[in-house]
Design a protein with these regions (language model features):
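Cytochrome P450 substrate-recognition site 1
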Residues: 1-60, 84, 88-97, 111-140, ...
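Conserved cytochrome P450 catalytic core segment spanning the I/J/K helices
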Residues: 49-53, 92, 124-134, 153-223, ...
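Cytochrome P450
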Residues: 52-63, 73-98, 106-115, 137-163, ...
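Central I-helix of cytochrome P450 enzymes
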Residues: 92, 96, 157-165, 192-243, ...
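Conserved cytochrome P450 K-helix E-x-x-R motif and the immediately C-terminal K′/meander segment
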Residues: 163, 234, 253-296, 316, ...
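Cytochrome P450 heme-thiolate "Cys pocket" and heme-binding signature region
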Residues: 209, 295, 333-364, 391-393
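Cytochrome P450 heme-binding "Cys pocket" and the immediately downstream C-terminal segment
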Residues: 234, 305, 357-397
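Conserved cytochrome P450 K-helix/beta-meander segment immediately N-terminal to the heme-binding cysteine loop
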Residues: 307-335
Length: 413
């Protein structure tokens, strides 16, 4: 495992759709390992996803979640079940959009709605079967993708996404634009572009694409799995709610990002969710850079390597009762998902570990804490917890196969 994640390997990047929508691998997630990638990643971490930067975006997360809580509290009738798949995706997407592009209304909001639609198409297209990805050495593989219309689909999606990014960058660089009180992600990227001569406009667009792919999908999927497990394990839900509500005792006060450091049991719930339901069960494929020998086996150069973190999280050699949702297993131990504990690697490890873990963890923990604090959650009438399907689906991101419908009741204390 150490060899695969930290040794002579690189991320396998011959993913046809991803290569196109990341402007020829000008991003972080899909770019090949080289000096240029190392420089971009260093800038990305220091400028965009550092702890200080995550803290600066807390206002947007608190505002977005606050709007959701108000909306759920005022819905009519109050006994109506809520589709959490749609609700949570819209929430996280709205937060990423607010952080990336700033406040939106009117025509801007309409254009963003179109962007959301095209982005959803992109995620579906990236999960489609591509002959080039599975048979990269066969000349006919690209012909097959063209024949079934996959290449044309990628191209259309790319052009629409690029058009939106170009419009946003132009608006932010307009000398007559009124600067907001807080810089959004595009402001930060433009500032970086002006300071760093090697950073191009395509780099900016590719990094924005990374933010949406990594931020929107993985966070909403993790939240859905967490709430699914909690509704099937009501004792765990009550324990998590008791911790949050004992901390936030003041009426009318909502959970704040600063509260998260004191919610130890909630963090165990998130760890246990990621152990059983990593957003990407197979990490982004890697390949060897050189011929190497591992445990007596010869591994040729350019060998593809797949890391099954889903299986690692359920390995009985590492975990007691591995199929059981039991957050208490993390009590009193320092196991985390930041890449140093190889039994729990939902976001990878080594030099290709996801650089945005702090932001993703904050989004998931804060949203989950807020929903558990403000509402009591029940299944619709006639539905038992045993009826809640835990079947998943997806090629790159593994999400619930069926929507999760729950009834939130406002907690009055």
């Amino acid at each position: 495992m150490l060899f695969v994640l930290e040794g002579n390997i690189i991320t396998f990047l011959n993913i046809s759709g991803a290569k196109l929508i990341t402007y020829g691998q000008q991003d972080i997630a899909f770019s090949p390992y080289n000096a240029s990638w190392r420089e971009r990643r260093k800038l990305f971490v220091s400028e965009l996803v550092s702890s200080k930067r995550v803290q600066s975006f807390a206002y947007a997360l608190e505002a977005q979640v606050g709007e959701l809580i108000q909306s759920l509290s005022l819905r009519s009738p109050p006994t109506e079940a809520v589709n959490l798949n749609e609700t949570l995706f819209t929430l996280i997407d709205g937060f990423i959009g607010r952080v990336a592009f700033g406040s939106m209304n009117g025509a801007k909001l309409m254009k963003y709605a179109k962007f959301q639609q095209v982005f959803s198409e992109a995620m579906v297209a990236l999960s489609a079967f591509s002959a080039q990805d599975f048979f990269p050495t066969l000349p006919m593989s690209r012909w097959f993708d063209k024949l079934v219309g996959l290449e044309a689909r990628y191209q259309r999606i790319f052009l629409e996404l690029d058009s939106y990014f170009e419009m946003v960058l132009s608006q932010h660089m307009d000398p007559g634009r009124v600067k907001p009180d807080k810089d959004d992600l595009v402001d930060v990227l433009i500032s970086l572009w002006k300071r760093q001569g090697k950073v191009t406009k395509d780099h900016l667009k590719a990094l924005l694409m990374d933010a949406f792919i990594g931020g929107t999908t993985t966070s909403s999927v993790t939240l859905l799995w967490a709430i699914s497990e909690l509704i099937k394990n009501p004792a765990v839900m009550k324990k998590a709610q008791a911790e949050i509500r004992s901390l936030v005792r003041v009426k009318q006060r909502l959970v704040q990002v600063d509260d998260l450091c004191k919610l130890n049991y909630l963090k165990m719930v998130v760890k246990e969710t990621l152990r059983l339901h990593p957003p990407a069960p197979l990490l982004v494929p890697r390949e060897t850079m050189d011929h190497v020998k591992v445990l007596g086996y010869d591994i040729p150069s350019k060998t593809r390597i797949f890391v099954n973190v889903w299986a690692m999280g359920r390995d009985p050699a590492c975990w007691d009762r591995p199929e059981e949702f039991y957050p208490e297993r993390f009590e009193g131990i320092d196991t985390d998902f930041y890449g140093s504990h190889y039994e729990l690697l939902p976001f990878g490890a080594g030099r290709r570990i996801c650089p945005a873990i702090p932001m993703g963890a904050t989004i998931v923990e804060f949203t989950l804490a807020s929903l558990l604090h403000s509402f009591d959650w029940e299944l619709p009438d006639g539905v038992r917890k045993e009826d809640v399907s835990m079947e998943g689906t997806g090629r790159q991101v593994f999400c619930r196969k069926t929507p999760l419908y729950l009834v939130p009741s406002v907690y009055t204390g």
